[in-house]
């Protein structure tokens, strides 16, 4: 059991200090008397159940003095102090005029996360199998929402909207680890370490407008969910062009070879407010897995490492796509009128029109990668000892040897450094080496 009494000057004296506590409890089941027979037979070597619960706080609440109203002098369009007329002859008031520049919220407070975890650790059959399982859940509440991201009616009269603690979000999932180690009578050893993680979050409450459709609200979707215009192939003929829904912007510039953008809400007009819909997942994988497999025998050894992810969407927004430069190689092949094929809308002498991208740059980011493979032989006896060395190892390995994915390239991320430079593609390498130990 532990606790912390935390304070932050971002909040008013009434909300500045909060006590957060947590605790954990474990039970070594394998040490109980009723487990003795299983331990003696080396069926169960160790089995432990554990759980924890606790709260932590977050004071990332925008401006430092958000609980205090910020007043400013009234100025004209040129930035000069402006005093209001006070008589029929137009003479100005001798007093300085102020207005509420930022409306405060004195009730701003710590955002809180209630973290819960329950799991178990195990070892079976004389250490042949071992691993763990964990189920976790984080309930976040009083999440900070800035005034700029709040929903206010059109008749709201102030220049700014006060910040608020209102958001709620749930994050949950589980982790599985399995380890295998087996040595045969002839000294041959097999071993494996494998992990799998599932993690999902859902926004339970945000300051969404009450009367908008559910697909336009953040509530019910994951943090970081992609919203996009939905494209349904290309406009291939003039008949298809004339039958497409009108577009709020640049409707007169739509051409054959552009994407057919779906009028998601069916009102006859494609617009940014009503026709961008949830698409795919977030940029963080919901499912991740990895495994390392090894084998050893009489100086020979081999191992392979593989990993992958699913439940993820990648927005391939490379620097070469800036300003709609549709002629770059990275963008893919243009639509052509001969067979209607291609990946990119028909090229123009000017920049791309609005809405044309659709889901063009949103890809299923799932992948399976064979990360490393190594084969080696190690001498530890005989002639190597006579030469005064303890061991000599020859090895051949490779990195990034195999990849299965629907992504258009093999990059860990879109950008490689601050400033927006494109990330260098993942490199395949082969190495041969000698390791000599004295």
Which sequence ranges carry the predicted segments?
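Surface-exposed extracellular loop regions of Gram-negative outer-membrane beta-barrel proteins
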Residues: 1-11, 16-31, 113-116, 124-131, ...
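Flexible, surface-exposed loop regions and adjacent strand-edge segments
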Residues: 16-22, 66-73, 148-158, 207-217, ...
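Extracytoplasmic gating/loop element in the C-terminal half of outer-membrane beta-barrel translocons
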Residues: 254, 309-398
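C-terminal beta-signal and terminal closure region of outer-membrane beta-barrel proteins
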Residues: 66, 159, 163-171, 214-241, ...
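Flexible, solvent-exposed coil segments and beta strand-coil junctions
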Residues: 2-7, 92-101, 147-161, 173, ...
């Amino acid at each position: 059991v532990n606790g912390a009494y935390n304070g932050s000057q971002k909040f008013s004296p009434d909300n500045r200090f909060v006590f957060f506590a947590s605790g954990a409890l474990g039970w070594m089941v394998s040490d109980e008397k009723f487990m003795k027979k299983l331990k003696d037979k080396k069926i169960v070597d160790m089995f432990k159940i554990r759980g924890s619960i606790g709260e932590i706080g977050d004071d990332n609440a925008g401006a430092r003095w958000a609980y205090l109203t910020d007043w400013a002098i009234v100025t004209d369009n040129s930035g000069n102090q402006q005093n209001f007329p006070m008589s029929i002859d137009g003479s100005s008031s001798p007093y300085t005029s102020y207005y509420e520049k930022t409306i405060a919220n004195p009730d701003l407070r710590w955002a809180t996360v209630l973290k819960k975890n329950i799991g178990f650790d195990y070892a079976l059959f004389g250490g042949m199998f071992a691993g763990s399982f964990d189920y976790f859940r984080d309930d976040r509440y009083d999440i900070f929402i800035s005034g700029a991201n709040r929903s206010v009616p059109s008749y709201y009269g102030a220049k700014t909207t006060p910040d608020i603690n209102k958001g709620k979000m749930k994050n949950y999932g589980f982790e599985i680890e399995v380890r295998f180690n087996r040595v045969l009578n002839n000294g041959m050893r097999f071993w494996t370490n494998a992990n799998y993680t599932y993690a999902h979050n859902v926004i339970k409450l945000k300051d969404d407008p009450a009367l908008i459709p559910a697909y336009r609200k953040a509530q019910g979707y994951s943090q970081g969910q992609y919203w996009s215009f939905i494209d349904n192939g290309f406009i291939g003929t003039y008949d298809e062009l004339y039958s497409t829904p009108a577009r709020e912007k640049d409707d007169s510039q739509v051409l054959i070879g552009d994407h057919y953008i779906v009028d998601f809400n069916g009102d006859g007009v494609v617009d940014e407010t009503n026709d961008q819909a949830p698409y795919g997942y977030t940029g963080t994988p919901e499912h991740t897995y990895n495994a390392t497999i090894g084998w050893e025998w009489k100086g020979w050894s081999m191992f392979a490492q593989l990993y992958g992810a699913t439940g993820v969407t990648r927005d391939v927004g490379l620097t070469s796509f800036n300003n709609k430069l549709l002629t770059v190689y990275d963008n893919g092949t243009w639509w052509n009128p001969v067979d209607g094929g291609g990946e990119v809308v028909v090229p123009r002498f000017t920049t791309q029109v609005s809405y044309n991208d659709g889901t063009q740059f949103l890809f299923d980011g799932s992948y399976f990668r064979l990360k490393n493979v190594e084969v080696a032989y190690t001498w530890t006896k005989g002639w190597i000892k006579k030469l005064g060395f303890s061991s000599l190892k020859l090895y051949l390995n490779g990195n990034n040897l195999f990849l299965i994915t629907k992504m258009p390239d093999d990059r860990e991320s879109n950008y490689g450094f601050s400033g927006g430079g494109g990330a260098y593609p993942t490199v395949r390498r082969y190495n041969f080496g000698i390791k000599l130990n004295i």
